[in-house]
Amino acid sequence: MMFCYQCEQTTRSPAGIGCTSEPGTCGKDEATAVLQDILTHLMKGIASMRAGRAMGVADRRTDDFIFYGLFTTLTNVNFTATRFVHLIQEASKRRERIKLLYEEAAREQGKTPEILSGPALFQPADSLEQLLRQAPSVAINADVEHLGSDVIGARALILYGMKGVALIAQHARVLGYQSDEVMPQAEEILDYLASNPTDLDEMLEESLEVGRLNLKVMELLDVANTDSFGAQEITSVRISPIQGKAILVSGHDLHDLKQILEQTKDQGINVYTHGEMLPANAYPLLKAYPHLAGNLGGAWQDQQREFADFPGPIVMTSNCIIEPGRSYKNRIFTLGPVGWPGVRHIDNGDFTPVIQAAKALPGFTADAKEQRITIGFGHHTLLGVADKIVDAVKHGDIRHFFLVGGCDGVSPARNYFTEVADNAPADSVVMTLGCGKYRFNKHEFGDIGGIPRLLDIGQCNDAHSAIRVAGALAEAFNCGVNDLPLSIMLSWFEQKATAIHLSLLALGIKGIKLGPTLPAYLTPTLVQKLQSRFDLDLDLIGEAQADLQAALAHTA
């Protein structure tokens, strides 16, 4: 039986928490859910051979595979069961190869190989039917009756954080950026999970290691994006269509977007970004393409309506895909780790089918009324005007900063974030990132002495920029980040948000408001431990005005 509770929208009922019947809330069927558990288990098995790295046993392709494989198991990434069967087979082969290399290196160096157990020895079956029979023994909640939900939840916190790390690392790796520090630490954490830990305090400390690793990975991706596409710059981006054939690119992968822009040059096709791809319009080497026409639509949960209305093909480069509607299923394409049964997948970097579809479809028949928003306030931009921001604070023009953003979702409780942003006083600045920004990024915020009151920092992955800016302000005021007139309100949905949140906790940042609901895997015991240590507030529903007043009172 399937069991999944990794996303914010997991089933919650009097009978219990977690999606236990198909389809899950995300649309995942039982086969896909349990195959993802098996693949994750095998990734731990590969990591269990980490002792070989010190003996010179390292395989970049296997390193890539670990991150790629974990990426496919995130919420709203891949729903194709047959694809997971192939990934499981590949994982098993890679694990055995690394095992042989490790044992050979140990013999050559006169060392005794470690005795392997658990995921390192698990043998996946050959057929889908047999794999489904094996799945219960490796499920996230395996043996919960004996271990208890606290232990399972603490393990889940680490695992889901690592899935988020894998996603961000994979985006950097496709741009050719890797770090000799990242993979050994990732293996260490996965190997720790493979040991089936049970000490709650120890596991919460290990979750902070996930956060520290994610800080390195986010910085690596920032360098990769900046080196590849230039530093984000303040940009007025069009958010209404113009006449012409069109392609819509959603997801997060800037490398994929660059390939599409390159292959559509001089083809008479306009390329639009969607969702978390919005910040692409602020990178100099991407916006230099004249046919990058702007951004259309909003956050991932609105895609079924927005994609149905779009008169051209759609390309999903990463999460978040949800079940394609009939009206556009034959004109949506997936790339890389993304997949949906019956949807065409491009795995060779050749976008000819997308281009052909764009030419065959009507496109936009007329220009819409021009609408624009301003983006591009990454840390390179903001640190360049840090002295101006500091002066505004010292002179009382800026009283408070709010960081409001993260993942969006369907829950009406997420209106909290709109209320906070819209009701923040005129002498405050709202920084935002992730697709949560779409709840208010088309609203008018004005400016303070030429400093825009709404600063769009970028994707969820660009939380690194927010951290850099907060650190620079703390240094300028000779205080800690927790002493700044800064309030952090984060919306979460999936595992990347978990990794980012763990990074903030690892930095010792307190008073974070997380919502709209409590992660299902955080039991009351775990919540109590987190709240006592990190001054966390996990109950946001209906408290926007009160939270604003409390934040401003603290500043005063």
UniProtKB/Swiss-Prot annotation:
Record text on cofactor binding: Binds 1 [4Fe-4S] cluster. Binds 1 hybrid [4Fe-2O-2S] cluster.
GO BP annotation list: response to hydrogen peroxide
Reactions catalysed according to its record: A + NH4(+) + H2O = hydroxylamine + AH2 + H(+)
Record-listed hybrid [4Fe-2O-2S] cluster binding positions: H252, E276, C320, C407, C435, C460, E494, K496
Binding locations of [4Fe-4S] cluster: C4, C7, C19, C26
One GO cellular component term: cytoplasm
Cofactors, names only: [4Fe-4S] cluster; hybrid [4Fe-2O-2S] cluster
The entry's keywords: 4Fe-4S, Cytoplasm, Iron, Iron-sulfur, Metal-binding, Oxidoreductase, Plasmid
E.C. code: 1.7.99.1
Gene Ontology molecular functions: 4 iron, 4 sulfur cluster binding; hydroxylamine reductase activity; metal ion binding; peroxidase activity
Protein's cellular compartments: Cytoplasm
Superkingdom of the source species: Bacteria
Cysteine persulfide: modified positions: C407
Family: Belongs to the HCP family.
Function: Catalyzes the reduction of hydroxylamine to form NH(3) and H(2)O.
PANTHER family according to UniProt: HYDROXYLAMINE REDUCTASE (PTHR30109:SF0)
Protein name: Hydroxylamine reductase
Protein source organism: Acidithiobacillus ferridurans
Upper taxonomic lineage: Bacteria, Pseudomonadati, Pseudomonadota, Acidithiobacillia, Acidithiobacillales
